[in-house]
């Protein structure tokens, strides 16, 4: 089992050094302690994650302060951007990082994000898969035809050329089993989360992924399913509860409001504050026991082993969902111990 670090939400504006101090510190820590990668999201127009409008820009900075850790778009919303723009930006990062770039490619879901590309929203899934193939071709240096300003089809080759001949690609997939199969058929990895499902249900989706790889003539046992999990590991379970309960409840409420405003959830009416509180409490209890990496090293190891049985090959540890920076720092040595326990057994 591999372990990486992923960021998604909180800007920690109170930190000295500004909004990006936390991700910078955690990326350095991950680099020193052998974590696989740091994932940088793309988020727009909301306090939750709004400091990450362009993951390539942040990755370019992280390239200058790290040496070994992979730098991953987690995720780039493909229908919002021209494929050539995606490849140009990340090729710069690939050069700056000496070939450490990987890309997770998402379809997008928040209708408000598509003020950046309103014509793309009605057929975003079709554009998603169409542009994935264009991104691959452009990365390889193959010309792709696009209409120029006069409407004439023009073959384009992007520069600078990336250092890696082939991009390592993840398909961001959560709810649709068919997306897992499609990722397998395309020879991509998968970035996913437990969005209202159990590990047992995730296992059914990872099986679809393996079926997709097999049907495409690929080794079904290769390819990585990466699972994002809210993470807090500590030697004392009481410290885990104290550190995550309040921040995680606030995180759930903010996330719920983002989904309501973005059109991903439609309940047909405006929810009351009491209803939102009740939903947050229910979600917290479910997440804590069945859908997060919360607990001692021994407890989280059991969960990670269960995830591996469900077909997961990497856990992306979400850190910035609300715990204080001091608490996040306090959890890191235990998270590193958890990671090391798998390296020792698997070596």
Language-model features: locations:
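Short, well-ordered coil/turn segments that N-cap beta-strands
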Residues: 1-3, 35-37, 66-71, 96-102, ...
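N-terminal beta1-alpha1-beta2 module of alpha/beta enzyme domains
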Residues: 1-65, 69-70, 166-167, 342, ...
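Active-site mouth loops of central-metabolism enzymes
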Residues: 7-20, 76-84, 164-175, 231-234, ...
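Short, acidic/polar
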Residues: 17-29, 89, 173-181, 297-306
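Conserved, mostly hydrophobic/aromatic
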Residues: 30, 34, 42, 62, ...
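Glycine-rich, proline-tolerant flexible connector loops at the mouths of alpha/beta enzymes
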Residues: 37-58, 62, 77, 109, ...
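Internal, glycine-rich beta/alpha segment that forms the wall or movable "lid"
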Residues: 82-188, 200-203, 207, 214-216
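An alpha-helical appendage that flanks or caps ligand/catalytic pockets
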Residues: 122-158, 200-312, 340, 346
């Amino acid at each position: 089992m591999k372990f990486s670090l992923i960021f998604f939400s909180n800007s920690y504006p109170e930190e000295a050094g500004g909004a990006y101090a936390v991700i910078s510190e955690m990326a350095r820590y991950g680099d020193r302690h052998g974590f696989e990668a740091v994932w940088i999201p793309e988020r727009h127009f909301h306090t939750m994650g709004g400091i990450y409008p362009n993951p390539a820009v942040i990755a370019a900075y992280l390239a200058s302060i790290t040496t070994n850790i992979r730098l991953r778009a987690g995720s780039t919303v493909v229908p919002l951007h021209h494929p050539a723009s995606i490849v140009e930006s990340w090729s710069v990062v690939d050069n700056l990082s000496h070939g450490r770039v990987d890309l997770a490619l998402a379809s997008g879901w928040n209708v408000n994000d598509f003020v950046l590309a309103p014509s793309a929203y009605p057929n975003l899934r079709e554009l998603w898969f169409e542009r994935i193939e264009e991104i691959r071709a452009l990365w390889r240096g193959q010309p792709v035809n696009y209409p120029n300003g006069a409407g004439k089809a023009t073959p384009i080759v992007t520069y600078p050329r990336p250092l890696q001949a082939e991009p390592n690609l993840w398909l961001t997939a959560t709810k649709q089993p068919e997306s897992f199969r499609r990722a397998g058929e395309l020879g991509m990895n998968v970035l996913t989360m437990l969005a209202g499902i159990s590990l047992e249900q995730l296992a059914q989706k990872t099986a679809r992924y393996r079926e997709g790889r097999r049907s495409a003539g690929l080794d079904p046992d290769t390819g990585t399913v990466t699972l994002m999990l809210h993470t807090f590991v500590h030697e004392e379970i009481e410290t885990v509860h104290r550190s995550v309960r309040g921040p995680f409840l606030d995180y759930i409420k903010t996330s719920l409001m983002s989904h309501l405003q973005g059109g991903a959830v439609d309940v047909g009416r405006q929810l009351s504050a009491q209803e939102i509180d009740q939903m947050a409490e229910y979600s917290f209890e479910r997440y804590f026991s069945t859908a997060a990496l919360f607990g001692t090293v021994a407890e989280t190891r059991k969960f990670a082993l269960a995830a591996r049985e469900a077909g997961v090959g990497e856990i992306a540890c979400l850190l910035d969902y609300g715990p204080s920076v001091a608490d996040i720092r306090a959890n890191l040595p235990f998270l590193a111990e958890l990671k090391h326990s798998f390296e020792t057994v698997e070596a």
